[in-house]
């Protein structure tokens, strides 16, 4: 189902007026994350998180795909990345750029893992500078904080001027690569194994991974 942005912003106003749940989220962020945005901006992050969760409960949604830029910033003044991260940590998958197939993928892999671990939504971006089978998985910051190997930072994204992005490198180790996708009624599922490896620093939430056969994986994505 598709819900209008206005309903989300109205719910944000409502939860900010009520205060209690928003205050809890603000306190959680200050305890578990390095906050490098203004207090009023953090309040908006918290309000967005609470509002999205309320609407998910109201409409019986178990995952969310949000239109994260750029109309939203004109209304609430923040990127939704940190709010997405907080919900992902609670087991409500939230993906960016209204990626419905990404939301379905998140539900599938978390169900396959019996919801014991959180998934993270990433773009498959550039080759590793020193590893022929390496690739950078990165996004503006929607990854759950339990994925991070360090205390995540709420700050500013690389490509936008509004606050609310998250920065952290993910833990290294074995992981599953998955993507459910569709085109004109034809559906497919890409599955692969990879491991996190060391690589250059970058902005956002990121991890460098090594696939067993990069060329084979690329051919089937």
Which residues does each predicted region cover?
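Conserved small/polar residues in nucleotide/adenosyl-binding loops
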Residues: 2-6, 215-220
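A short, gly/pro- and small-residue-rich
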Residues: 77-93
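Charge-patterned, long linear interaction tracts outside catalytic cores
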Residues: 1, 62-71, 158-166, 176
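Glycine-rich phosphate/diphosphate-binding loop of Rossmann-like nucleotide-binding domains
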Residues: 4-27
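C-terminal catalytic subdomain
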Residues: 91-208
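Short acidic, glycine/serine/threonine-rich loops at helix termini
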Residues: 12-17, 74-80, 131-136
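Active-site loops and adjacent core secondary-structure elements that bind or stabilize anionic groups
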Residues: 2, 28-53
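Accessory "access/gating" subregions that flank catalytic or transport cores
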Residues: 41, 45-73
